[in-house]
Amino acid sequence: MRGCPPLRQPLYFFSMADQTQKMISLLGRMRKQMNGAVADAMYYYGQNYGLNYGVSLPTIREIASTEGKDHSLAQYLYKQQVRELRLAALHIADPAQLSCAEASTWAEGIINSEVAEEMAFAVLSLSPHLAAIFHTWSSSDNEMLAYAALMAVARRQQTIDVEIITSIKDIVRRHSSSRIIAQGAVALLSAAAQNTELTTAIKESLTALGEGSAADYIREEMEWRLEALQ
């Protein structure tokens, strides 16, 4: 499995003034839905952003959907240090235009598990280059990138093969005490378990996980899940 080559040059050019006007309009609609209590709670649990209005994810998705797919706008919004704009960008981005090379610029914005999950849900799982991006991100020392990669493949069940399952042991060993990596691995293996032809590979992967809290969590979760499928 080959990963992504480095990004060599910008892929999109756009009118800064036009994008700024669209951003201001989106931000105004987001601010009307702000919830300070939610923002404070997210900060307490480590969901740090430059600016956070505490707007719910369903509302962000709904507002973003009115823009349609506009990849250059999404790139612009994603660079802003505002939670709602960064998350909206992931639903405005066109997954078909997420090239393997461009993935590195999106990776820089994955600063917490919330962004990682939305990236996996809205963009990465729908990208035609998912396999290559998975290889690159899952090999990263950045647990958020690895988590996004695991969750994206879990959502696109048909892409899971023996090679991907085998790679989980290396991901878990690299992040042996990470709870979110453990959760991502469980999500992927649970999706893989729907295909009985992969059962042997899953069991071998669980045996090869090694030691650590992440490995223990994965084995415990997968034990009852596999039993339930028998």
For the regions a language model picked out, list residue spans one by one.
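Cationic, low-complexity basic patches in intrinsically disordered or flexible, solvent-exposed regions
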Residues: 9-10
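Alpha-helical scaffold domains
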Residues: 16-230
